[in-house]
Amino acid sequence: MTKDVISGMSSHMDKTIDSLRKEYQKVRTGRASTSLLDEIKVDFYGTLSPLNQVATLAVPEPRTITLQPWDAKMIPPIEKAIMNANLGLTPANDGKLIRLNLPPLTEERRKEIVKQLKKFAEDAKVAVRNIRREAIDDLKKLEKEKKISEDDLKRAEKDVQDVTNSHVARIDEVLLHKEKEVMEV
């Protein structure tokens, strides 16, 4: 019974870490990545569609993203959507292809990004601790209902804390890896 609570808690914490990784993918580093454009929606004949559903995205060079719309008439709406996304990118088109050149990040901007990364990591840690609290509450409820003994509760609480510590350490690893990536010139 305690194993169910702990495994449910662990999978919930794993989802929190996955969510953090997805959030980090959206953060601009010094390198071009199509994931920078994941959140951009384009007006495609009256319907808001993700950018990757109206154009082919590619990264031909470390600081360049190219977009090749499937329909040449889509170039102006795609450029407008990119400008409205406030990513600090200026689209340039040659009639068939849109190029996005990523300017190099300044030292000051890199430090701002690292601050943002640390905030995301702290939010993830808070979420993990909240999941821990819910799991401990569930275990105490089981003990109150006499479904587990007090000794089982103490053992399970220790296991919950161990799982929590390992997930917090994984969050720190993810942060450290992304921080290195951002600070790399």
Swiss-Prot record:
The domain of life for this entry's organism is Bacteria
Q: Which GO terms describe its molecular function?
A: ribosomal large subunit binding
Subcellular location(s) of the protein: Cytoplasm
| Main localization (coarse) | cytoplasm
Family label: Belongs to the RRF family.
Q: Which UniProt keywords apply?
A: Cytoplasm, Protein biosynthesis
Which InterPro entries did the record assign? Ribosome_recyc_fac, Ribosome_recyc_fac_dom, RRF_sf
Q: Say what the protein does.
A: Responsible for the release of ribosomes from messenger RNA at the termination of protein biosynthesis. May increase the efficiency of translation by recycling ribosomes from one round of translation to another.
User: What species is given as this protein's source?
Assistant: Geotalea daltonii (strain DSM 22248 / JCM 15807 / FRC-32)
A GO biological-process term: cytoplasmic translational termination
Q: Which GO terms describe its cellular component?
A: cytosol
Keyword Transcription among UniProt keywords: no
Q: Know the name of this protein?
A: Ribosome-recycling factor
Entry annotated with the keyword Protein biosynthesis: yes
Pfam families of this UniProt entry?
RRF
